[in-house]
A protein has these predicted regions:
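Catalytic-core helical/loop segments in enzymes performing group transfer/polymerization on anionic/lipid-linked
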Residues: 1-614
Length: 614
């Protein structure tokens, strides 16, 4: 690199005022989208840190992130992390992963940049200076601004179409416990302890209504154990619980002074042992190493802080879950992923108590080799469960392709879609709306921090908005509920004020009122299945292609330069439109079996386990 006298390494903590006096005799490298936009706005020539990473190196970083996030499995330290059969480090591995993605990317980029440094003066943000020390560089701090190092579950955010509310996890738990006390008198069944029941872990009451009703019809008692979110939060969820006689144990049902005292005592003891464990720098330096360089010195205080923040609550959750399992002795436990902390705890303790655990497929899973690795890491597929109930033959074929234990996997369908199959699908085009389902970068892959990808997402949005306007079609944009906003509302306003952008809206009604469904995102949404069931053609603009999961037939992939003509053809040519729908129905029949009766099949299978075990 032929650098000037100064090199400025910029991230979002550095303002224009921090660097304006360095413009003439400095080279600039930006490390995130905000800093890139800031320099672009001020017409400052700069390089982007992404440009120092080769395409295949993004795969290397992603693989390393899986390994770093599973640090707790290292045989030299895993025993020290156990509490009542549960590895405490595993309970926040997803949170650590989300924290590490931008950190490891930045560290890898600094390694690449530093290999060609030939300048004397290097200025950087506080966090980049800290990373530089791991490489024996003393960068000069150019800004006093602190980097926001909050962790994913430090706060809970509640979004509506009109406002957003953020609560600390502590305040959220207080409100949750209060709401349980409020609803407790209305759920008489919660006072019972059944002898023959299934335990549902973290199931959404309203979305699970058909499943709860079917259990009731088959005289199977259900205990709904929800710790991350309340089982009852409004009149509809209360109605479902009362109607299905579902048992909802509250915090007050399970807690007592002895448990609280023990949690406090064990937390303090475990914290002391973790402090000692974290002094084993030789072990951790080898775990957190990339390209032959360790970043343990940088990570150590952050990992310890995260562990400390989550420790007492984790031990409390273990004690509560142990109480519910021991008290009710369910015939089986149902979960929808193995990654959530409640699910992990229930899975570990159930194994010891010899209670079978069944994993139900939840959502549209990736099918490529890279996608399978992500599924495995996020524990969306079976790792430790006794059985895995999938939606159809498509997932069975994938399970076989990746050498999963086929004796434990059963294709029974999706209870979540039964009601849709029993609706009469529209056969004629009655609406002129276009529905755009977006999933911009949600920061769960290192490539989603690539500035080019963010620019590409926004350029694709603009193209879709302009196309809808030119075709004189009303466009409704439905944002993914867990997505951070990427200025979709502002972009829409600049192009066409009639474009409606929503985050919280009934998805079924949006699909029903649309003529064509357009997908723009890094993964296939289950809403695509909903649209196909309702006879809506689904098209997709390429974005986030790194896993290669988009040739499965679920939707038509259309390049940007063909988008307008293909969309016009779908709208105006009935034969072409019908052919797309028929092709997508073939995919649907492979992906979802037992259409309209999956709930009965699932409950029938569980009924056998309740009566005779696995």
């Amino acid at each position: 690199m032929n650098l000037k006298n100064n090199l400025i390494l910029i991230d979002s903590t550095i303002s224009y005022n921090d660097i304006k006096n360095f413009e003439k005799d400095s080279d600039f490298i930006t490390f995130d989208y905000e800093s890139h936009v800031m320099l672009k706005k001020n017409n400052i020539e700069h390089k982007i840190s992404d440009s120092f990473i080769k395409k295949h190196e993004f795969d290397i970083i992603q693989e390393k992130l899986y390994k770093f996030s599973n640090w707790y499995d290292d045989e030299k330290i895993s025993k020290e992390l156990k509490y009542k059969y549960v590895n405490l480090g595993s309970l926040f591995y997803i949170e650590l992963w989300m924290f590490l993605i931008p950190i490891v990317k930045k560290f890898f980029e600094i390694i690449k940049i530093s290999s060609n440094l030939d300048t004397k003066n290097i200025f950087a943000s506080q966090i980049v200076c800290q990373m530089g020390r791991c490489l024996q560089f003393e960068f000069q701090n150019i800004s006093d601004a602190q980097h926001d190092m909050n962790y994913f579950y430090d706060n809970f955010k509640f979004d509506s179409n009109f406002f957003s509310l953020k609560l600390s996890s502590k305040n959220f738990n207080k409100l949750k416990n209060l709401s349980e006390k409020f609803f407790h008198p209305f759920t008489e069944s919660s006072k019972k302890t059944p002898n023959n029941a299934v335990l549902l872990i973290e199931f959404n009451t309203v979305k699970t209504e058909v499943l709860l009703q079917e259990f009731r019809k088959n005289n199977i008692d259900v205990i709904s154990y929800c710790r991350r979110r309340p089982a009852i939060w409004n009149s509809k969820s209360l109605q479902v619980i009362r109607k299905t006689k579902c048992i909802v144990p509250s915090y007050s049902d399970l807690i007592n002074d002895k448990i609280l005292e023990n949690v406090s005592k064990e937390s303090q003891s475990k914290l002391r042992s973790i402090m000692i464990l974290f002094e084993n720098d030789n072990i951790f330096s080898k775990i957190f190493e990339i390209n032959g360089v360790t970043f343990w010195e940088f990570l150590k205080p952050y990992l310890f802080e995260l562990f400390k923040k989550r420790l007492e609550q984790s031990i409390l959750e273990i004690e509560l879950t142990y109480q519910i399992l021991k008290k009710t002795r369910p015939k089986c436990v149902l979960i929808q992923s193995e990654s959530g902390n409640t699910e992990q705890i229930a899975l570990s303790i159930s194994k010891k108590l010899k209670i079978p655990v069944i994993l139900l497929q939840h959502g549209f899973l990736k099918s490529s080799e890279g996608g399978f690795k992500l599924n495995k890491f996020t524990k969306s597929i079976m790792n430790h469960s006794d059985q895995f109930m999938v939606w159809g033959n498509f997932m069975l074929d994938n399970a076989q392709k990746f050498n999963m234990d086929m004796k434990k996997i059963f294709a029974l369908g999706a209870y979540t879609h039964d009601e849709l199959f029993n609706l009469a699908p529209e056969s004629e085009q009655k609406n002129k709306n276009l529905l755009l389902l977006t999933e911009g970068p949600i920061w769960d892959d290192v490539r989603e921090y690539n500035i080019h990808e963010l620019d590409e997402y926004k350029n694709s949005l603009i193209h879709i908005f302009q196309t809808a306007k030119s075709l004189k079609r009303k466009l409704i944009v439905k944002l993914h509920p867990y997505e951070n906003d990427h200025n979709e509302q502002e972009i829409a306003k600049k192009i066409d004020s009639s474009i409606v952008v929503v985050k919280k809206r009934n998805l079924l009604s949006l699909i029903q009122s649309s003529d064509v469904v357009i997908l723009l995102g890094t993964s296939i949404s289950t809403a695509v299945l909903d649209a196909i069931i309702l006879n809506k053609p689904v098209i997709r603009l390429p974005f986030g292609e790194w896993y290669g999961d988009y040739g499965d037939g679920s939707c038509i992939n259309i390049e940007k330069n063909e988008f307008k003509e293909k969309l016009k053809q779908i709208i105006n040519n009935k034969e072409f439109r019908q052919q797309i729908i028929e092709d997508q129905k073939r995919f649907l029949n492979d992906y979802l079996i037992n259409q309209g009766c999956a709930t009965q099949k699932i409950v029938s299978h569980i009924h056998k386990i309740v009566n005779s075990g696995i």
